[in-house]
């Protein structure tokens, strides 16, 4: 490349880079990929951004393809000649992705998948305490949802503004088996009208008595829930987590309440223990105060005792299937 060509190309290269970074920032804000080589979504994010850069650079440079439309061969030819470093990055990341898939495959790592779940021998008589009949849960999640919706419908000041989340978490609250669910904003306009104070309550359903209750946070001397999945912009739960924990991969967050009735989002942190992408397991959790946004990360062994669920049932079943299959 001659000096004159370099002087003409460099500013346009920088402009292309700035445009790509702007597009990437917006896309990151929306898609929220974990910046982690164990996360397959991170590879997609990087690949597409690199391809966007090549396309933007090609358009700004004013490449003459000889026809109105840009064909695939034009794109590939331009990338090969003008974007060698970008192409090299794509090739390297593609190689990492493919190798990562291979070294994570059960066909090559069957023993590792078998050992993922530590299975020991226990004594049922000494380890399982008897439960009285009035402590046995009698209600599944679907039934709890019906009771919760019905209870919210009785409250004229809330039913027109809020819905009940479909996610009812089973917990032990003050010695009772309870399902708890957050409220959600009915739509964007109802969010706009209520977001300053936050969600004013949550739903609890006693799994033994089948009694549903709307717990108003103001009655407990607590602030409304300002951080939740139904929030928009920076107080959206997943976005808040991503901006504070850029590299963490999270399992599905769920609502729990401590013994004082304060709602917390329990956000289990996932890792991959086999190769790059295999052997999902939980190594800790972020606890986020739904009212104040206060948050902290805990390793599994340090998680407060009032937290009832860190491992999901689906993950345990998956690991048990690996144990039996391999």
Please provide the spans of the model-predicted regions.
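Soluble extracytoplasmic regions of secretory-pathway and membrane proteins
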Residues: 2-326
């Amino acid at each position: 490349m001659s000096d004159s060509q370099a002087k003409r190309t460099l500013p346009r290269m920088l402009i292309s880079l700035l445009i790509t970074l702007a597009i990437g920032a917006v896309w990151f804000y929306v898609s929220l990929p974990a910046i982690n080589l164990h996360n397959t979504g991170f590879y997609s994010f990087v690949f597409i951004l690199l391809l966007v850069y090549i396309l933007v650079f090609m358009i700004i440079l004013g490449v003459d393809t000889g026809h109105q439309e840009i064909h695939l061969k034009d794109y590939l030819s331009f990338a090969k000649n003008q974007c060698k470093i970008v192409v090299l990055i794509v090739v390297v990341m593609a190689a990492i992705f493919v190798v990562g898939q291979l070294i994570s495959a059960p066909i090559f790592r069957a023993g590792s998948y078998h050992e993922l779940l530590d299975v020991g021998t226990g004594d049922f008589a000494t380890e399982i305490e008897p439960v009285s009949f009035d402590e046995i849960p009698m209600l599944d999640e679907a039934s709890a949802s019906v009771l919760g919706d019905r209870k919210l419908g009785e409250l004229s000041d809330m039913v027109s503004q809020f819905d009940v989340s479909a996610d009812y978490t089973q917990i032990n609250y003050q010695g009772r088996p309870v399902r708890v669910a957050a409220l959600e904003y009915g739509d964007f306009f109802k969010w706009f009208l209520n977001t300053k104070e936050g969600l004013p309550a949550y739903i609890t359903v006693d799994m033994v008595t089948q009694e549903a209750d709307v717990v108003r946070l103001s009655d407990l001397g607590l602030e409304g829930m300002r951080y939740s999945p139904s929030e928009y912009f920076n107080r959206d739960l997943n976005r808040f987590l991503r901006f504070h924990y850029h590299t963490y991969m999270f399992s599905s967050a769920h609502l729990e309440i401590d013994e004082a009735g304060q709602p917390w989002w329990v956000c289990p942190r996932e890792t991959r223990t086999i190769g790059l992408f295999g052997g999902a397991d939980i190594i800790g959790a972020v606890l986020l105060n739904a009212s104040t946004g206060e948050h902290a990360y805990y390793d599994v062994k340090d998680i407060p005792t009032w937290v009832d669920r860190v491992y999901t049932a689906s993950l345990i079943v998956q690991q048990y299937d690996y144990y039996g299959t391999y």
